[in-house]
Amino acid sequence: MSSVETLKAMAAAAAVALIQPGMVIGLGFGSTAAYATRMIGERLANGELREIVGVPCAEGTAALARELGIPLTTLDDVERVDITIDGADEVDPYMALIKGGGGALLREKMVAQASRRVAIIVDESKLSPALGTRFALPIEVVDFGYRATARWLAAQGGSVRLRLRSDGQPFRTDQGHLILDWACGPIADPTVLADRLAARAGIVEHGLFIGLATDLFVAGATGVRHIVRPDCGRIAP
């Protein structure tokens, strides 16, 4: 296991320790979140956890959870999600996030919004002084007029590209939508930008996750830091 993969596993283990028997758990998507899903499956198998149920954020997560024997349900069939464990592509000092590198941003945001607690697991490379500095912002869009939407985004600054699969065909989300990756540069006010994007017809969802993360687990050379979101202000460096 590489050093980066080791850090991902460390962060995942710290977050999974929050899970208690009887919980409804949001299962995130991506390479880091997969570590958490596997650890949940292991704890179920050895009897450390019982009577839990998972709400997967993507079809890929659902498939992995089934392989591991994790009971699943849907967001429609639960009143609340006790805790969601997921990764992030970029985290700013206020615990705002860019997510959607795996293309599951819509479902991830829906599950996060339904959760009492959202634990984000990352390694130190994902920390950033401002969102957009290190990672392009994923924008989920409908097919109709997607080029017009891309032009509108580009007019705001930066560059836009249609996300493609390895075979050169357009990437499709689980909902069948397209993804535009907008390299917009550092975002001065994520809340203002989120509102503008939400108001634009043709945009289904964007990768800005603001005010959703309650817990941040950051793995680095000295171990794992557990940061709880303050009511206001920056997280401690």
Swiss-Prot record:
Keywords: Isomerase
Recorded GO MF terms: ribose-5-phosphate isomerase activity
Alphabetical list of InterPro entries matching this protein: NagB/RpiA_transferase-like, Ribose-5P_isomerase, Ribose5P_isomerase_typA_subgr, Ribose5P_isomerase_type_A
UniProt key word Isomerase: yes
Residues at the catalytic site: E108
Pfam families xref list: Rib_5-P_isom_A
UniProt-listed GO biological process terms: pentose-phosphate shunt, non-oxidative branch
Biochemical pathway: Carbohydrate degradation; pentose phosphate pathway; D-ribose 5-phosphate from D-ribulose 5-phosphate (non-oxidative stage): step 1/1
Isomerase among keywords: yes
Taxonomy, superkingdom: Bacteria
Positions bound to substrate: F29, G30, S31, T32, D86, G87, A88, D89, K99, G100, G101, G102, K126
Reactions this protein catalyses: aldehydo-D-ribose 5-phosphate = D-ribulose 5-phosphate
Family note: Belongs to the ribose 5-phosphate isomerase family.
PANTHER family on file: RIBOSE-5-PHOSPHATE ISOMERASE 3, CHLOROPLASTIC-RELATED
Role this protein plays: Catalyzes the reversible conversion of ribose-5-phosphate to ribulose 5-phosphate.
Name by which UniProt lists this protein: Ribose-5-phosphate isomerase A
Species in which this protein is naturally found: Chloroflexus aggregans (strain MD-66 / DSM 9485)
Phylogenetic lineage: Bacteria, Bacillati, Chloroflexota, Chloroflexia, Chloroflexales
